[in-house]
């Protein structure tokens, strides 16, 4: 049953952890850490906690928030829930691209910040987010146009398909806003400014998505409550754009300008 599946998952995680440590100890000399730690670096631990605690808190509260939104979906009946579940498989197509771009953004930001390449850092955020937006916009439009045959691969029940199509039309055409917003958030996380992104993530969920879902349900539009998802994406995008007006980003821009001026001075010919 459920308890057995949970126990099996826990055992698998511990075995995976133990196997990974043993493999690393045997094959990589630079990773000869003990099975149990004997000490720690206070400065390094503080740096890890500074980034990890806000992100962990964010993920925990975000999961609780999703339960609250799911409760609204459940109020609409099993047919509606089934439709949303099926639609989620189609929107997951765009989700693959978003995950890929977001992973690239956080690595790109961290590497270039560490290397002091501020000019590339500044250009990269524009290039990555634009690429993510264009790709997901195309995916969203194509999947929306052909959503009924795509959704028909998972269910043939007319009522379920109607609910799934409604979900798709409310979410997929606007998925590009989530792609741009999430890439910006990943990029900013890569620079270490996790407090800002944590506040934004909690804001769009607890101040936008959840209230909007319950308001739509209270007004009798519960079967369109998925509109709260697209609304939260748009608000998140605007909020993340606001980061680039903050003093933190201003410092990076000044460093990029100083680096650019230095490179220009080195490459300009000397007049005799």
Regions found by a protein language model. Give the residues of each.
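Hydrophobic faces of transmembrane alpha-helices in multi-pass small-molecule transporters and flippases
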Residues: 19-22, 37-68, 73, 93, ...
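Hydrophobic alpha-helical transmembrane segments in multi-pass membrane proteins
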Residues: 55-67, 99, 131-140, 144, ...
